[in-house]
Amino acid sequence: MNKHYDFSYTQDRELSWLKFNERVLREADKKNVPIFERLKFLEIFTNNLDEFFMVRVGSIHEMSLIHDDHRDIRSDLTPEEQLDEIAKHVRPLYELRDQIFAKVSKELEQKNIIRSKIEELTKEEKKKLRSYYEAMILPVLSPIVIGKQHPFPHIPNKVLQIGLLLKKKEKISFGIIGLPRDLERMIFFPGDGRRYVLLEDIILYYCDDLFENYSVEEKAVLCITRSADINPDDEIYESTDDYRTHMKKIIKMRARLKPVRLEFEGNDHKQIKKYLSMRLNISEQD
């Protein structure tokens, strides 16, 4: 690269894309946009960001391992510098998304579309919810305590999990529960089509009972995003399979690639985050 090149006239492609996605997000904050369209913009922003981490961030991660001295032709940044800049730009976008979602949720509450907190339900509502949990959710849960009998499992890409920090006789363990994919995520109250509880909130509320003889020190809803940086035309993936079979194999491989992002809901997860970052070999800022 020419050392006299003025990089102020060009911009890193990934940072430019994040600015574009921010404009998508800000559409959700416009009062003149119908409320369900605002929810749609929030969904588009989130889906865009998922794909960005899977493909673009995944690719830069790979580049940082193979060619750590490579410099981007538009910004003169190394892969590590690009990842640092992406992290700096993404964090405020998450905060903005949460702020906008909180506003939209408040407006939905005025229309009686309410995400109920289990702690605030009446005794009768809790009784019905407990019955639903025991009949429909509990039978399909597969809780695991990581240890000699259960080594650290493969955590699927973009599937919500409940992570728990467990304590038994001063020994700390890690537990995990995958959210069942076949169940509806929004559970509406009978006879009331607008008040609902999320599936993960129900499991999070009752999951202590699944770990007998343990005390639950921390618990949180989490999600892992894995790199999807596979080129189906690369020679190492060539085969004699028909194209459909070949692409199915590629999709399966994408599901097992390196984690590039670790997301949590809420704030009570400091030790869980530290443990998973170590086990998944991922920076705590990712």
Region locations from a protein language model:
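N-terminal non-catalytic structural scaffold regions of very large proteins
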Residues: 2-286
